[in-house]
């Protein structure tokens, strides 16, 4: 796991007074789900899953349940908003850098065709 993701997870779980683990207890599942959905806006579902030692299908499941969770799962929305804020801080820059790298590669390839 890269340092940005590790730092993101530490900053996310600290105010929730949770230590990330693989428990199926509601507070852990809720926190994990909210963070996975927020991270999936900046990373592939496979990358998100790997950062939690989970398969991408877990991220797909949580993403699909997100809207329902916002309305029916007490505390989920607050966790999600915290996760979004932290992801925008920690992951947005990386996402932009990756896109710029791809564009630079495409420009070089196109210049080679000219």
Stretches with model-predicted labels:
Residues 55-60:
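Helix-turn-helix DNA-binding helix
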Residues 46-53:
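Short alpha-helical "recognition helix" segments of helix-turn-helix
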């Amino acid at each position: 796991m890269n340092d940005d993701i590790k730092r993101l997870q530490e900053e996310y779980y600290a105010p929730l007074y949770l230590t990330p683990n693989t428990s199926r207890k509601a507070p852990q599942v809720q926190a994990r789900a909210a963070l996975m959905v927020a991270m999936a806006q900046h990373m592939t579902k496979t990358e998100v899953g790997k950062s939690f030692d989970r398969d991408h299908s877990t991220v797909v499941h949580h993403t699909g349940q997100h809207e329902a969770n916002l309305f029916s799962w007490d505390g989920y929305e607050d966790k999600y908003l915290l996760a979004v804020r932290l992801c925008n801080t920690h992951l947005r820059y990386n996402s932009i850098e990756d896109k710029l790298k791809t564009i630079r590669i495409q420009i070089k390839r196109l210049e080679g065709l000219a």
